[in-house]
Amino acid sequence: TSQTAESAEVISHAPVAVFSPKTLRTARAIFENINDNRWKAARRKAAKLGDSLLETLVQWLDLERDGKQSFEEISAFIGAHPGWPRLRTLIAHAEEAITDATTDTMVLAWFDSHRPITTNGLVRYGEALLREGRDTEGIGIIRRAWIEGNFGYRQERTFISRHHKRWTREDNWTRLDRLLWEGKLKAARRTMRRVDKDLQVLAEARLRLRLNRGGVDWAIRRVPAHLLNDPAFLYERLRWRRRHDRDNAKEILEELPFDLAHLQLWWIERAAVVRQTLAKGNISAAYQLASNHRQIEGASFAEAEWLSGWIALRFLHDNETALNHFTKLYDSVRYPISRSRAAYWAARAAESLGRAELQQGWYAKAVEFPTT
């Protein structure tokens, strides 16, 4: 199972120890209990065995299960074992385990050293701050919970009834915009009525485009003129056109501003349109779309530079331009496999240019990472 694999990973980093045959038999029985989901039995055997590392390992595996343990136990484990793996998962479980029975003193002490990362954590922390009379801090956290949080239906109704006067209509729009970007459409639908009319119309158009339902043209026609160039609206129109293999998808990409949010999502759509354009034989247009990618860093930047270089090399036979893209890619990535890949393609471009010395230099860089 995955948990057995995780336990093996932890043990692999532990100091080498020699176990007696009895200890090994008990350890085997413990992990059989875990595989059978008999956690109480596994923890009893681990405690009885008296091996502190094994006991801690079994507790860690148990605490990783979602919603199974108390805030007190999880937070105590994190405090005692700050160097253990996957602590962010445990921190999230600790926050989700905070209940009405958890004292404000405990909640505030916890968040003094841990920034809230879950919806329940934000709500519990904000409410504890308000009860302590720390209104400015508390309202700030409550607003953040509303903007960033993902609530179940009943949880959302309770939260709104308690705190709806603590945030603004602008906060409602910030939340709605996020939910639409993230595809959380049921929650977005519930939030739509809390924003101004023009923004409701915009949100409705985005939602219909995302769902690929009827009435798209009607919804688009209703969008006010001053919102027609809203980047999120353009993104959904781009996705709709790309899914319907419309040639005019690239028109949206050609006119975009450079200061876009959600760059990775934009790149996914741009890359798909680039490949569609390439498949139709529009090679120069495909290259222009790829090379004007707007990406700044990370995996999407690397993919964009590679695709631009590949089109230049294989289709345009513009070897100098291809070499520039692959060199830029090499200079921007850090993982060995990425650097090896960039160097290999730079070598291919140098080979096409007939620059043998440069080609050999790039091939030498490519093989510096033998594990790739």
Descriptions of predicted regions:
Residues 33, 98, 129, 179, ...:
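Residue at a conserved register position within TPR or TPR-like alpha-solenoid repeats
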Residues 122, 127, 131, 172, ...:
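Repeat-solenoid scaffold signature
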Residues 12-19, 43-53, 63-67, 75-86, ...:
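Solenoid-like repeat scaffolds
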Residues 1-23:
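Compositionally biased, proline/threonine/alanine/serine-rich low-complexity intrinsically disordered stretches
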Residues 26, 54-55, 59, 74, ...:
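TPR repeat positional signature
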Residues 39, 71, 104, 135, ...:
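TPR-repeat structural position
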Residues 24-41, 174-179, 236, 240-243, ...:
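Alpha-helical segment of the N-proximal tetratricopeptide repeat
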